[in-house]
Amino acid sequence: MDTLHEHEAGNLYEEQRVDRVGDALTADAGDDADTLEDGQQQQQQQHQQLLGVNRQMAILLDAPQEPPMAVFPARGGLNGPPRLRKKRSFYTMVKPSPPCESQEPEMCLLLASVTRAMRQVREDQRGEYFANYLVENMTSQNYPNGVGLPQHWGEF
């Protein structure tokens, strides 16, 4: 076991000695800047080769990091720490009003009077009565310039 540690220590010393000899030969004072520059140049050359060979790869490599952080400020961007969004429940969004017998849907005056009059007619005659009532009462005398009538579907 001791021989293993001695062997590893010997290799470590050997690597340091090789670095010093290389530094002395290149006269770069041991900062290894030349090897870093060589590595960067080699990476740039490989990158340029990829760009020339495959346009799709070039587009992917040159694309900015996605998604941009400014799009999601809740993740800790400009507004600070992330906040959890409250999830909405379909059951609590709208509360139904209590059923009321006297409450009728909003409608124009003509339809309100038709429905009141139709309550007094037998069920089998209601369709005919409804049409006749509208023909008789939907006149320009009763509703001058269309005041009181709905202007479009769903208004009343």
Curated annotation (Swiss-Prot):
The keyword Glycoprotein applies. Keywords: Developmental protein, Differentiation, Glycoprotein, Spermatogenesis. GO terms for biological process: sperm individualization. Residues 26-48 are annotated as: Disordered. Glycans are attached at residue 137. Transmembrane segments: none annotated. InterPro entries: Soti. The keyword Glycoprotein applies. Post-meiotically transcribed gene that has a role in late spermiogenesis; required for actin cone progression during spermatid individualization. Belongs to the male-specific scotti family. This is Male-specific protein scotti. It comes from Drosophila erecta (Fruit fly). The gene is soti.
